[in-house]
């Protein structure tokens, strides 16, 4: 950025920025009257910042008030920057005082993020940005009614080793305990959050069928979890958090593997369901625990307030028979919004029926998932397509070739 040049310019030659996110002031507004009193008392002592094309970057309100006082020209500091830098400078100059138009500000920051611009230079910290996006863009999380059972009866399309591209999301059909699975999936990226629901080792079987790796000897199950958790730890950012749903009956193995893999156990959250789940125990289960933590010796990001508790009350999915231990989308969206920002990568190494991916889609995050069972990869793919209403942004990378989903199905692959 070059040094600003000072000049006195006619107000009629200055162009207000159409994107300016500041709320427009009018006579009688407290801020308007403050600016007016200052100009009357001290004159126009603070130059307006304008770009070389005469677009006002900082000083819209002062120009408006000055014109109302009869000024025809004002002192200006002229800079020569591109439009992306101009927008960032607008935010930075206006951050200290005044009120924002929240929607315009959120759109402007999103525009900068989409241009890969470092929005930190605007003076807004990540938690402030996420809070802003939450106010403006967050909407009620919607559950779906995708028929998983019907999908499971169809011929399997997915194959081991496939990498599915579902819009901005990536799903690999592979084994979550193998490092090479993550090498292919992540492409060198690191996850900003891990949220997953591994097999519980309780030998669950419902109409959707058994979960793979759900009936192991105690020591084997620990080794399985440890291997998976180590891969998660190695593919997370230093400040990423991790959430692990599990069964209380296997709590010892989960906690032992969690800590030994390199995580700090901060606490255990509880999903309180609206109805019990019939089982063999004298006490019927109406909750599921979820480990919460982050890397040992590291830090973690938090984007919510201090009023959140360890009890999460969400109704079970009406079609929970679709996948054993299936989670509602709103439940998965809750920790996602607490521990990540829009545009962040959320890793789920046990994607199952895809609730994490559905929650990421609705909250503006990017899901990178692993699923071992080909038939449930099909469930994830078609659940996404049904939510989007189109398969236009769905592709599979198979044998080094990127194939549109429509071509794959039309070609009869898997029939």
Predicted regions and their residues:
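Core catalytic lobe of class I
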Residues: 3-377
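S-adenosyl-L-methionine
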Residues: 162-183, 381-415
């Amino acid at each position: 950025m070059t040094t600003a040049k000072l000049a006195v310019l006619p107000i009629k030659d200055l162009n207000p920025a159409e994107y300016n996110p500041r709320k427009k002031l009018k006579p009688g507004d407290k801020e308007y009257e403050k600016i007016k009193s200052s100009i009357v008392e001290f004159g126009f002592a603070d130059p307006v910042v304008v770009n070389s094309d005469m677009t006002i970057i900082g000083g819209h309100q002062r120009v408006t008030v000055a014109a109302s006082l009869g000024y025809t020209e004002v002192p200006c500091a002229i800079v020569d920057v591109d439009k992306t830098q101009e927008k960032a400078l607008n935010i930075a100059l206006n951050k200290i005082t005044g009120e924002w138009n929240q929607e315009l500000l959120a759109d402007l920051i999103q525009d900068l993020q989409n241009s890969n611009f470092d929005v930190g230079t605007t003076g807004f910290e990540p938690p402030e940005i996420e809070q802003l996006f939450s106010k403006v863009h967050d909407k009620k999380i919607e559950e779906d009614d995708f028929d998983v059972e019907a999908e499971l009866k169809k011929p399997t399309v997915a194959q081991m080793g496939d990498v599915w591209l579902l819009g901005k999301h990536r799903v690999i059909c592979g084994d979550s305990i193998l490092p090479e699975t993550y090498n292919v999936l992540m492409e060198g990226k690191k996850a900003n959050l891990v949220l997953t629901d591994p097999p519980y080792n309780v030998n669950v079987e419902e109409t959707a069928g058994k979960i793979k790796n759900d009936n192991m000897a105690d020591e084997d199950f620990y080794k399985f979890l440890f291997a998976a958790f180590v891969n998660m730890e190695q593919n997370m950012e230093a400040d990423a958090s991790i959430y692990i749903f599990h069964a209380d009956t296997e709590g010892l193995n989960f906690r032992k593997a969690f800590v030994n893999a390199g995580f700090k156990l901060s606490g255990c959250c509880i999903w309180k369901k609206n109805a019990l789940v019939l089982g063999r125990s004298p006490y019927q289960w109406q909750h599921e625990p979820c480990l919460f933590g982050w890397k040992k010796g590291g830090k973690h990001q938090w984007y919510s307030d201090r009023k959140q508790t360890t009890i999460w009350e969400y109704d079970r999915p009406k079609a929970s028979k679709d996948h054993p231990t299936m989670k509602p989308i709103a439940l998965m969206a809750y920790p996602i919004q607490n521990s990540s920002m829009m545009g962040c990568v959320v890793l789920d190494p046990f994607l199952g029926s895809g609730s994490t991916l559905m929650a990421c889609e609705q909250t503006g995050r990017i899901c990178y998932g692993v699923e071992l069972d080909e038939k449930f990869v099909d469930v994830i793919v078609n659940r996404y397509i049904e939510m989007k209403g189109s398969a236009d942004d769905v592709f599979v990378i198979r044998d080094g070739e990127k194939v549109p989903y429509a071509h794959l199905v039309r070609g009869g692959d898997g029939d």
